Amino acid sequence: MFKREETKPVFVGGVQIGGQKSVVIQSMTTADTRDVEKTLAEIQRLHDVGCQIVRLAVINEDAARAIKKIKERSPLPLVADIHFDHKLALIALESGIDKIRINPGNIGSKEKTQRVVEACRERNVPIRIGVNSGSVEKRLLDKYGYPSPEAIVESAMDHVQILEDLNYDNIVISLKSSDVPTMIQTYSLMAQKRNYPLHVGVTEAGTQFSGSIKSSVGIGTVLSMGIGDTIRVSLTADPVEEIKVAKQILRSLDIVNNDPVVIACPSCGRCAIDLIGLATKVEDAVSTLKVPLKVAVMGCAVNGPGEAREADVGVAGGNGEGLIFRNGEIVRKVKETELFEELMKEINEIVNEQKPTTVG
């Protein structure tokens, strides 16, 4: 089985996928790609919360041509999502796209596929083969009875073979399913076939709540096996929420440790402060920081500092007041109305010791 450190490095613009321990976070815009300003505004929002690569829907030639203007001002590398029409891929490449998402077996004749491959080769643009449970060919459904992990992998390998026959190996592969166990098994099987980097995700995961859970279980399980080089959390929600979930998945697995994490107790009858409101406010305030920081927001002073002694900094509520602590040691007592501001002072002090960035 090829682990992420053993996969073939592929470059999307200046971002490396594969051949390393780190995992790249992606998303996809919801704006009409032809609307350049709206698309750029969405890309900027995604960039600001930690997205590293963004995909655009290319539904016609106007969208493909709009890529040129978007590319000129985009802070992120761009991926063109293309289905069936090889001309759109060629126009996107001429417009400066950084990566193409196609299935070679679905864009027409061998000659059309070869034209796209040669255009990608000239520009050193990778191709992502994107197979999911809904795109498995009828012959494979007849063979396996349903979109099984084996069927999805065989479908992907058929597309891979087309590119390999053209001596093209600048490839990324995704094999998504809306069924989490199927998705996990599929990536495990694929990791035994080739050392191409894998794009991991649960397709059609659902709304923000249910989709976040399905994606966390599916993506998290695959990543915990050492498999997966880039991820996209698919949610029926603002794409910014996809990035937040993706970052927490990576942080929870210690794949990245340069982002803050907020831990908070579930509250109980001893809690005498607005714990939920405070924890949410703190999480929002530290979300844009790029420092390894663990912040604890605890509901009471009975065992708050002790339970959160591994945190760098935190608060423990009391009756109209609370304790500020660092590394499990109490620093001072403050009024409840001052808890957030005093905690942010401590956080800024820690941040300033590492880099000149402030929040609050």
From Swiss-Prot:
[4Fe-4S] cluster binds at C265, C268, C300, E307. One of its GO terms (biological process) is terpenoid biosynthetic process. Disulfide bonds: none annotated. Pathway: Isoprenoid biosynthesis; isopentenyl diphosphate biosynthesis via DXP pathway; isopentenyl diphosphate from 1-deoxy-D-xylulose 5-phosphate: step 5/6. It comes from the Bacteria. It is an enzyme of class 1 (oxidoreductase). Keywords: 4Fe-4S, Iron, Iron-sulfur, Isoprene biosynthesis, Metal-binding, Oxidoreductase. Converts 2C-methyl-D-erythritol 2,4-cyclodiphosphate (ME-2,4cPP) into 1-hydroxy-2-methyl-2-(E)-butenyl 4-diphosphate. This is 4-hydroxy-3-methylbut-2-en-1-yl diphosphate synthase (flavodoxin). The gene is ispG.
